[in-house]
């Protein structure tokens, strides 16, 4: 067999679960509760312990046999008494009623319910049993409740003869009196019939054999008794009716009460209650004899006092068996008690709002309202408005307050007031300087080297050799057009190189390169010597106070003279170390890679002397090397990190724009997440294309970055408006003189911002008498429809540098006759614009007839004019073409088409052989057989 649950074992052994659990724990068996399982061995152990305990209790059970025998004797006495005549029983009952009244009126007797039973004798020698004699000892377990008690049920009846049913009922009611009183409130609302059924079901050993007839209302017809005035409101029936039992019941032994009285009784604390009464339905009161009818004067008051106290009558407030109500509803009393208890209970205090202390100093801003001040002062806005009202200031909670009002309010509260000082977060130069001055946690960083020199002296070839790539082949004409930033690794050390253009147009870009560099490598061709851009590069490097390393290139060419180059450079303060100076000269050949490693070693040596360091743990700051507008990525900027570390997702302000770093790409085209100091990266995620040499600063959050970027953009726009020249009396003559000049309107679009600036500066420097260049728009990116629309509206020329027009822009330019010039070398762009300014300024146009129409029919239409119907004889007719009306070889009118239709549809063009309908704008004198010529004006190319 398997294991068995504790509760199953306890059920088999007829013991309590708790006893089994206690025995199991004493035996060391692991049992938690009645649902725990025990095996056969454990079951045997527990059985043995239970048998030992039962053996120990055997003597006590034998000692209890003597009271049992006495109980049997008393039971026999009851049976004999039941066989006596009915008259004796009636007489006994009458005396019992008298005893009951005397027992009730005695206060001490009512309070001694749990005392041992004692017998009393009347004057005639008859024995009267007290109520406590028939009480059972209180059960330790909870009994089924039955609250149907009546006053007459508590009468200690000695009548054990004819009316055995009443005796048993009274005994039963007394046995369950404690349980009934405890649960009286739960069954008050039950009907009488339901209570009777409950009682019969719960006490099977006392189940009656027949139904109990219900007494009706007392009338003359049925002869039911009425209450007797001197009997405390009881109904008294004739003794003859009470002598006949109406149903047979199981009669208990008469000595049951004595048996219970002999057993030891334990009292438990209980609330003192008045004596409960038995149910009137089961025990009908006996008529009071004439001798017992007179009562003391205090009996009525005593009964009233008992009834006022409740009297323990569970039928109080409901209809009795005779149809009368027995008082008011007990629930009302219970509700009143609960209400009094709630009123007497201590009430919970409402939570009070904690008053927060005032700040020592009120830091305010001009324009704050009462609501804003309330948050700072930890006060309600209504309180502040009330205080201001008392001070003579009428405001509402949303009205802005001036400085004096806020200080007056602070004085009333007894605190100081201080106006908040706003820090200009849009001043990037100040932030940039503060971050650069930060000397905490400095670590060595790679040097930033800028390669400078004249055009075609081999700068890009040298850098190409260093990176082992072929950058020069991708440049148009072999000339570097914009800055490139690269990193080279030598002996586990990095060097950052910047390649600057050598053309004169890129002066600003060279100056920017010198500003952000640590070391300048000046490349000079051994065969050409010092050239104008070489001298300019020297000046930029000296202005930036950057050390210069001279790389004499092309020493492999025939006719190369490095010593002559060294002599020329001494005139500009660059004296070789061999000649007693401090400038490092390295003779190299970039094409063949000669002495390249020596040049790199000299760069690292110079970097060690400079002790270059940066703090990688702070917020990143740096400089924009180049910027452009990518078709797929949007604005793209090449930046050089100078301090801190730039991370993907950092809020950033670049020049006059802002954004969040979406992605970073290094010089090899690979995505990176972090950019350390001296590392060039290409970033995306900014809102607009910044200018070259703009500073960038990383902010703590995007909100601050947005505010700083918008403020800088606003200031830049205001500065641009200030630069507009307005006409005044002082410059009126100059303005009129300039009005006589012819202007060449130009729109410049380039791939990067540096190229845009260089091309614009070069075009503005062109000097032609009577003509000047007016750059109406310059931007980075491809030529789009907006540029073409602007050019068409202002009659301007579009110059594209390393960019191409979009398909839609190209089609629109052809339609609007906008001239687009595309270049990849800056020389040709400058020369072409200069040639146009010197004599071929005004374009030449010639007329070209594109088609003719013969008028077949004319239809006058109101509010439209004359509609012409005809066929296209030759060529084609377009909607935007000019028309000329010819009649008999004479031109009658020249103008534009008003509309062009084919059937009911508006069309842009009708070809030869198709019929059409048209109108001529502002002309209606059209006749049949007139000829209409369509023509366009085409520009003659400049030769």
Curated annotation (Swiss-Prot):
GTP binds at residues 453-460, 499-503, 553-556. Residues 331-342 have a biased composition (Basic residues). It comes from the Bacteria. Residues 92-103, 110-124, 191-205, 239-250, 259-271, 346-358 have a biased composition (Basic and acidic residues). Transmembrane segments: none annotated. Residues 453-460 are annotated as: G1. InterPro entries: EF-G-like_DII, IF2_II, IF2_N, P-loop_NTPase, Small_GTP-bd, T_Tr_GTP-bd_dom, TF_IF2_bacterial-like, TIF_IF2. Keywords: Cytoplasm, GTP-binding, Initiation factor, Nucleotide-binding, Protein biosynthesis. It holds the Pfam family EF-G_D2. Its main location: cytoplasm. This is Translation initiation factor IF-2. The gene is infB.
